[in-house]
Swiss-Prot record:
This is Pescadillo homolog. The lineage of its organism: Eukaryota, Sar, Alveolata, Apicomplexa, Aconoidasida. Keywords: Coiled coil, Nucleus, Ribosome biogenesis, rRNA processing. Residues 259-344, 492-601 form a coiled coil. GO terms for molecular function: ribonucleoprotein complex binding; RNA binding. One of its GO terms (biological process) is maturation of LSU-rRNA from tricistronic rRNA transcript (SSU-rRNA, 5.8S rRNA, LSU-rRNA).
């Protein structure tokens, strides 16, 4: 074969590797929405124009969307395409019988037998091992939790069924940990605050629903596997009484239900069992009376046969009652393991027993869901304002109370309770919600003095920093920033004014206690202590650890910080410019860099000539 013919064949092969979106849709007989949904489920994404080799880019257009031939093969062999076609035909039939023929009975039959598709086989293909599926939980959990807060609006594309499913899965996940370790892999996700949703027309919510439809099946698959590893059944049973309560996740877990609440639920179940047993006894007595009458009338042979049948029925009923009693005893033994321990152990530092023997009362204005799950997962107990709470507000066994006092809370229902704080000052400690998060991050119980009501809270540090090198860098940056601020004359003038004001306030505090608040006094003292600490640190470095190299390092650090700040400001200003002005600015920068390079070369040549002489 001639060389030119070989080259022509090679070009055709490269051209056939990439197919446009419209060609694939025509071959598969799919709409854009169906094709998009199928690509999301299969994890297939289009190719960039830059990925195509340079030799064959001339015959491709930048604005079009291209897929590879291997992607087309994966999509063509998919079973869901047939389900999409069945859904189309069923919708056409429904419109025909509803609008033209007005036959409601057939419409009901179509709705009952409406086709559905499943994504189980796709997840097994994409994730043959459970560890690969766990790696993608970061995006799945954040999307499901955010979608559960949205209201249903099918005109935009937000379906009510998926919202309910995402809420149920959110309650199945035990412990709303922002970071969890599953199968030796760390997973992080976000729990957003309660917000009022704003529907933007630029956002296509139908695409989001397609992603969440995939994430819901993935999360169910992982939960099923994890429950089976622990020897548990999925989906777990739920208590009907706790469905409409704030703590929906308690209705799925027997281990987290407290002693008093479990007794109430057992009494309801026992009453139902007693009613069933009474009905069974009545049926027994009726059967025995009928047997005696028939025995007197019939012969001796028939008597023996009937008495045997009656005895067998009695034995079966006795066995059923024995099985029910055994199940009740097993449930009671399980609940005894969950009893509240009175003795406090200060040495327990593990996360599971961190809040052991602590009882927290949570007010209605607090972030109830997150706090409740953290406390329960760490071995604590919870109280709240409802009939199903295990402890009431007036109970003396409560150790901590979580609330935040503000001007808004004074008009709420909790105002009466907040005004009566003096009654419980010696028995319980009043805490802000940051206390629980800081205790969990440090894996130890902290003192409650810094987290009392109407006090400025300490800095909330991120718990995800594991590298010691990163911690050292943060400390250096803080020191350099404080040093830069101390060197600025404007900042020093403001500090001096604050010093004089704080000293005058400290001297005249005893005279003007009613005029000055506690927060202002504490802020003034903190500013004074901070400035004193900086001065002492600078003096100690100059006296004991004086090295000229350290001074050079500090100066270099300051220069680097200034350069970084200047670069960030330049980038921000670039974004505000138009395209033409950006191009001009880039050309100016390139010209300046060229001039600098030429000057540096000229200086080097001159230095080398002097050395040679």
């Amino acid at each position: 074969m001639h060389i030119h013919k070989l080259k022509a064949k090679i070009k055709k092969k490269h051209q056939e590797k990439y197919l446009t979106k419209k060609k694939i849709q025509k071959k598969l007989f799919l709409n854009e929405s169906e094709f998009r949904r199928l690509c999301i489920f299969k994890g297939i994404y289009p190719k960039d124009y830059k990925d195509i080799p340079l030799k064959f880019r001339n015959k491709f257009y930048k604005n079009k969307v291209y897929y590879t031939r291997n992607d087309y093969k994966k999509l063509s062999n998919e079973k869901i395409i047939q389900d999409f076609r069945k859904i189309k035909t069923s919708l056409k039939r429904y419109k025909k019988y509803k609008i033209t023929l007005e036959d409601n009975e057939r419409c009901k039959n179509i709705i009952k037998n409406f086709p559905k598709y499943k994504l189980d086989h796709i997840i097994k293909e994409r994730f043959p091992i459970l560890v690969y599926a766990v790696e993608q939980l970061n995006d799945a959990l954040t999307a499901i939790i955010a979608y559960s807060f949205l209201p249903s609006n099918e005109n935009i594309g937000i379906k009510n069924n998926l919202i309910n499913q995402s809420i149920i899965l959110r309650n199945h996940v035990k412990g709303y940990y922002l970071q969890a370790e599953i199968l030796q892999k760390k997973i992080t996700w976000l729990i957003p605050h309660i917000f009022t949703p704003y529907f933007d027309k630029s956002i296509d919510f139908k695409i989001i629903t397609n992603f969440i439809e995939y994430y819901v099946t993935l999360l169910r698959f992982i939960l099923y596997k994890l429950y089976r590893l622990d020897g548990m059944s999925y989906p777990p049973k739920e208590y009907k009484d706790l469905k409409n309560e704030k703590l929906n996740h308690l209705s799925f877990d027997k281990n987290y239900i407290t002693k008093e609440l479990s007794n109430e639920l057992e009494t309801k179940e026992s009453t139902e069992d007693n009613i069933i047993e009474e009905n069974e006894k009545k049926t027994k007595n009726g059967k025995t009376e009928n047997c005696e009458k028939n025995d007197q009338e019939n012969e001796k042979k028939t008597k023996n046969d009937k008495t045997k049948n009656c005895e067998k029925n009695d034995q079966k009923n006795d066995q059923k009652n024995d099985q029910k009693n055994d199940q009740k005893n097993d449930q009671k033994n399980e609940m005894k393991q969950i009893e509240h321990d009175i003795i406090x152990n200060d040495n327990t530092k593990s996360v599971k027993n961190l809040f052991k023997n602590h009882i927290f009362y949570i007010h209605s204005n607090m972030p109830f869901d997150v706090l409740s799950i953290i406390i329960l997962s760490c071995g604590g107990t919870i109280c709240w304002n409802s009939l199903y709470s295990p402890y009431k507000y007036d109970d003396k066994s409560i150790t901590h109370e979580i609330l935040e006092v503000s001007e808004e809370n004074k008009n709420t229902q909790d105002s009466n309770k907040i005004n009566n704080i003096n009654e419980y000052t010696y028995k319980r400690s009043f805490i802000q919600p940051q206390y629980i998060f800081d205790c969990l991050n440090s894996n130890m119980i902290l003192s409650c003095e810094d987290y009392n009501i109407n006090k400025t809270l300490p800095v909330h540090l991120s718990p995800f920093i594991d590298d010691d090198n990163y911690k050292d860098l943060v400390k250096k940056d803080e020191y350099t920033i404080n040093k830069m601020l101390s060197e600025d004359p404007q900042y020093n003038k403001s500090i001096q004014k604050n010093k004089t004001n704080s000293e005058n306030k400290x001297n005249n505090y005893n005279d003007n206690e009613n005029d000055m608040s506690e927060d202002e006094y504490n802020n003034a003292i903190r500013q004074k202590l901070r400035n004193d600490a900086l001065n002492n640190q600078m003096e100690a470095e100059n006296e004991n650890n004086y090295n000229p190299q350290n001074d050079l390092k500090q100066e270099n650090d300051l220069l680097n910080v200034q350069k970084i700040n200047n670069q960030e400001n330049i980038k921000r200003n670039k974004l505000a410019l138009s395209k033409k002005k950006r191009k001009l600015y880039n050309k100016i920068e390139q010209a300046e860099n060229r001039q600098k390079l030429t000057i540096e070369k000229f200086i080097k040549k001159s230095k080398n000539k002097k050395k040679q002489k």
